[in-house]
Amino acid sequence: MRPLAKDTGMSVASVTLASALQVRGEALSEEEIWSLLSLAAERLLEDLRNDSSDYVVCPWSLLLSAAGGLSFQDHVSHIEAAPFKAPELLQGSNEEGQPDASQMHVYSLGMTLYWSAGFRVPPNQPLQLQEPVHSLLLAMCEDQPRRRQPLQAVLEACRIHQEEVAVYPAPASLHISRLVGLVLGTISEVERRVVEENACEQRNRSCSLRSRLHQADGESPGAPASDALQPRRVSERSAETQSSLERCTAHSRNSFVNSTFAGAGPCDCEESPWYGSEPMLLAEAESSQPATSSPRNFLQRKGKFSRPEFILLAGEAPVTLHLPGSIVTKKGKSYLALRDLCVVLLNGRCLEVKCDMESTAGAVFNAVMSFANLEETTYFGLAYVEGEEFFFLDKDTRLCKVAPEGWREQHPKGSVDTFTLFLRIRFFVGHYRLLRHSLTRHQFYLQLRKDILEERLYCNDETLLQLGVLALQAEFGSYPKEQVEGKAYFRIQDYIPARLIERMTAIRVQVEVSEMHRLSSAPWGEDAELEFLEIVQQLPEYGVLVHRVSPEKKRPEGKMALGVCTKGIIVYEVRGSRRIATSQFPWRETGMISTHRKKLTITSSTTGKKYTFVTNSSKTCKYLLGLCSSQHWFNAQTGSKHPSHRFTGQDKFAQIASLSSAHQTQANPITWIQKLSCSENELCVPRLQDATGGQLGTSMENKQGFKEPGKERIGSSPYTGGEQLHSIGLNQKPAQTVFGTAGHSMCAGSNCLGRRTQICCFDSVSGSQNSKRKGLFGEPNQDIVCVMLKRDPVHGFGFVINEGEDAEQTRSGIFISSLIPGGPAERAKKIKPGGKILALNHISLEGFTFSMAVRMIQNSPDDMELIISQPKGVCGTIHSEEKNSTASSGMFCTDILSNRCQGRQSPHIHDQDRSVRGTEMAQGAGSCPPSPLQTNTGEIYFVELVKEDGTLGFSVTGGINTSVPHGGIYVKSIIPGGPAAKEGQILQGDRLLQVDGVSLCGLTHKQAVQCLKGPGQVARLVLERRGPRAAPQCPSADDRMGDVHMAVSLVTARPGRPASSVSVTDGPKFEVKLKKNSRGLGFSFVQMERGNCIHTKSDLVRIKRLFPGQPAEEHGAIAAGDIILAVNGKPIEGLAFQEVLHLLRGAPEEVTLLLCRPPPGILPEMEPGWQTPELSGDQRLTMATCAGSEQSPSLDQEDNWRDSTSLDAGEGLSPGPESSYKDVRQVKGDREKERPWAKSWMHPMESHPHVCKLHPEPETPALATSLEKDMRQNCYSVCDIRRLGSLELDRDGADGATCFLPESSSLTVDYEEYLTLTSASAGQLPCEECLEADSETIPLPQFCSLGALLKSSLPEESQGSESDWEDLDEPVDRDEVLRWTRSARQPLAAEP
């Protein structure tokens, strides 16, 4: 953070303008804008003179000081800064030369203040600004640089305004201070005083205490004699005191060291300046004690066993420290009342502190930190234990307020209760690189190591064994060469929790850990500790302070706990020894936290809903409130202020990335911090199950737990004598990255497989991990560069990317591994191998996996802008041949479309590559964006929509609190004529990834809707194409009024091969393993009888449709039309339809399918919409209620297609009234005259010798209304019960095939919902009887009332649930839910 001026230092208490506006909740006033404008213009001019204006002015880079100052920070994200960048900066360099920096800053400043003036102001309301300032801001925001106001003119306008206002105008700094006060007002007064303390005075005091404490043997040559600390004799402890210490630390003590001042006695407070607000330490350890500056000298002791530090030091004699007692004058007499306070350090050492009852926790804390020689005191605090929970003390808390009653009272015999405090970590950093000192990192290791051993921090068995081996490497060293096999060289209980030992037996665990230790290539010593921290910091419960609570209403399912971290609050359900996260409240979605007696209430700022929890006492309730306040305060501080120290290499990059108010884009171990918005920190953080495992499930406000690293700060104690905060208001934003799969690479060139590929290497690919760890702190600073690349027809963009740890890359993300010689990237002369791609075409890659980044580069336009963070070092290259680069390196090119490549890939990769080629050819043909039909599956595309009447023109479905896998947000329907429909690129089923830079990963449905309803008029969306199986786009109103043509698939043989020789088994066979979720397998199938086509020798079971977001669709290898050959090894050839259905439904949770993909042209395409003709809007039918039971008409036995239907389909099926039936016939007759394609069906199709033929039937079909199409598309239905006319294949010799319409039909009513099949709902199939093998007629149930139909159709879990699908638009009327469909001989479809 830069100082405001050379003589004025920026206060530590500084916040961003965006944070101040979030807390304030309204726009800036006109006077505040003038004040900011004046100070910012002066600051910009000063920075331009000093050539230090390498930043972009935006609400997240503008820092406000509590002293009224203003500065700018340069570590905001590209996503946040992009809307405020000058147009000439976004366009890059031009022929006219470099743009003027001052004019760019003028534009950014004007946009920032204009944004602040319109913060949360509805678009239809004017800004509350007078003409002078409004005109000035508009002039500053001109697109043309020459038309903008210069900075000197802006300053002159501010000066004129100051002269025109009142005689004594308020200074600009006063407005700044008030804005900062709004943010600081959300924390306790104690924390504010801590913030405003003079940092220099703290450092001086800390140095003085340390120098007094650590004088060797009490002899310091340069110290005055009066200040010398002289140790006294070592005395034996009495049995009484010994017993108390044993109770305090659970370890035996034999002796202790007592060091005090010579002649200690009552003293006057005026004799020393240290007797003011801070106590003076009067004792030090005896010279024989181990030096605290080298706490790990004992680690390589050669004993029978090597034991952890916190166990060895716990058995040593305690060290006595003396604090001066407070001078109490009573009736002219002074007296001193000392008590023994036991403080246990993280390394297990016990300190016996002699203190006064009136001493504060801050005095003891300062003395302990000085003794331990810990300089980074921010992360630590003193806590006492109550039950199994730690309660941290505020620095101003007096010990007598929290000590046991027996400790406060003075007994005649001198026996008092023991009062024990523990030094523990309160703020857990996101990564160990953020800690400056190795001793601080060692303290983190010690606490996490012990917490895992004591099972305070949960992790799975595999991770426990891995961490045990790393701890053994750190504390014992490498596996001993002279070790005798089978002989124990360590105590297993010192490294593995008792729970795992009991389950696996001690002998088995000992053998397994020893073997892992022998085979381990991990470093030893401090490097092993860092690797230990790296893994632990990815655990779900890392950094969370957990306290037991109860729900407001007692529930039988179990206990609850509340976890507080720097990102928010997590609600756990306690089941045995495990905690399962059920709800989470990030600060940005927490409006207020309040307490009333024993009740703690959390109010959501997005939904307004209140969540109440009950604690065991009012003090605990207030403590939790203060803890939340301190966590929120610490999050705001770390998110807005500039790093207080300079980092080098990776350290600086990680620190800037972590403390940025924009987002916490950190290195590889920090990938769990998901960026939910571009300027704040978020609660939900996906973690790794273990070091190499997959991600855990996520959740935001409802079920499915999910966690992130937290950092705890000294909070307000519920027991302080002062006023207690009873409610706090919270409003912030979040940050995210997504962890991808390591080991993949992708080449952005054109012919990278045809030439040698360069692989970036730093020192040595096979280098030791020790040198790798040391490089983390010694690399040069990172450069952030912006590069514009133009696609080359030969080399593409000219660089190769990969993801994950490669050589020295220890961060997660998308990295440039090498440059292609002669390519655009190399010609740019700015890109170096090893750099991390932060953004591509103004879209941050922090929310994208490797495959998504590949698709973005493949489908990007010819001009691409890259934001890269790269080291200053030069990387070497390793050349490999084409074979190695494709087989082992996993390289991918945008045009790897040759047959040789496809031969080595899976079937779904073939399809992707073919679609990629089609996309790139389309893009190369012109500059216009590709149409939705041209885009390939999985493509990431960018759309800007301008809201109309406050809506974007589409509705969404999904969310982390719904049953959609991974909690994705999908486009549910497109409103005809709306912004999305006009834009034309968005299709139903596409997945929404980002909205205005805010990632939708991990959001609930309501939160996603809230993001889409943001205050901006223009929404910038990032979507992922979900493939051709997504529902087609909703037709416009004009299309619905016109004719709707029936899509017909014509089957043709492949050229050059006789039709008689074509077989459905010619296609590739492959095996797929699917795991059922709560909704089943996620696909429907049809059974096609052998009489349908000459190429089928038996009945075929084919995949009809894949449901979005379900296991089959998520797997990626299955496509509509695939033939099912076997289920879990059992062939289905010859099985009846019902047997296949039961085989799939009765399968275990994991199902193995043997599939075959038929060659193109052999079988009809599986297009779900081709069998359903529709009526136009003016020909909709009305439904008449029919009482009584009616028997359904008998159906022909010549059904040739049996299409199964999902079990969650509607249950209200009934034949329609006769009048309506006649109307349908009339409608058909009228519409047939207008359809030329209907006539073409009546003639032979000689060009297709083996096309399907329909049976002649006199009756016309009942056409569905256009509402059916609307509902089928908008609701994304997967559960149609359609009884449409079926096709039959009938060979007709040389006459070809003639198509006729079905003979008979009837009407049914169907209510559809977007649900998927569950195997448990097998009995809910509306017409189960029709699926029986011997059934020749389909009895339809009697018609029921509309209310009963809706009630019976809705599953119980969806009624009154907050997780139901919600649209952004008005809900469909209940009457429109019912529709008419044809029900002739069309079979049913079922979903396994």
UniProtKB/Swiss-Prot annotation:
Compositionally biased region (Basic and acidic residues): 908-917, 1220-1236
Region described as Disordered: spans on this chain: 211-246, 903-930, 1186-1236
Domain PDZ: 775-861, 950-1035, 1079-1167
Chain ranges of the KIND domain: 15-197
UniProt GO molecular function: 1-phosphatidylinositol binding
Subcellular location: Cytoplasm; Postsynaptic density; Basolateral cell membrane; Cell junction, Tight junction
InterPro entries assigned to the protein according to its UniProt record, in alphabetical order: Band_41_domain, FERM/acyl-CoA-bd_prot_sf, FERM_2, FERM_central, FERM_domain, FERM_N, FERM_PH-like_C, KIND_dom
Biological processes annotated in GO: bicellular tight junction assembly
GO CC terms: basolateral plasma membrane; bicellular tight junction; cytoplasm; cytoskeleton; postsynaptic density
Keywords assigned: Cell junction, Cell membrane, Cytoplasm, Membrane, Repeat, Synapse, Tight junction
FERM domain segment(s): 342-642
Oligomer and partners: Interacts (via the second PDZ domain) with CTNND2 (via the extreme C-terminus). Interacts (via the second PDZ domain) with PKP4 (via the extreme C-terminus); the interaction directs FRMPD2 to the basolateral membranes. Interacts (via the second PDZ domain) with ARVCF (via the extreme C-terminus). Interacts (via the second PDZ domain) with NMDAR subunits GRIN2A/GLUN2A and GRIN2B/GLUN2B (via the extreme C-terminus); the interaction is direct and is likely to promote NMDAR-mediated neural signal transmission. Binds GRIN2A with lower affinity than GRIN2B.
Function, in words: Functions as a scaffold protein and likely plays a role in N-methyl-D-aspartic acid receptor (NMDAR)-mediated synaptic excitatory transmission. May be involved in synapse formation in cone photoreceptor cells. May play a role in the regulation of tight junction formation. Binds phosphatidylinositol 3,4-bisphosphate (PtdIns(3,4)P2). May pNF-kappa-Blay a role in the regulation of NOD2-mediated NF-kappa-B activation in immune response.
Domain notes per entry: The FERM and PDZ 2 domains are necessary for localization to the basolateral cell membrane. The FERM domain binds to phosphatidylinositol 3,4-bisphosphate (PtdIns(3,4)P2) and is sufficient for membrane localization.
Annotated protein name in UniProt: FERM and PDZ domain-containing protein 2
Species assigned in the record: Mus musculus
Upper lineage: Eukaryota, Metazoa, Chordata, Craniata, Vertebrata
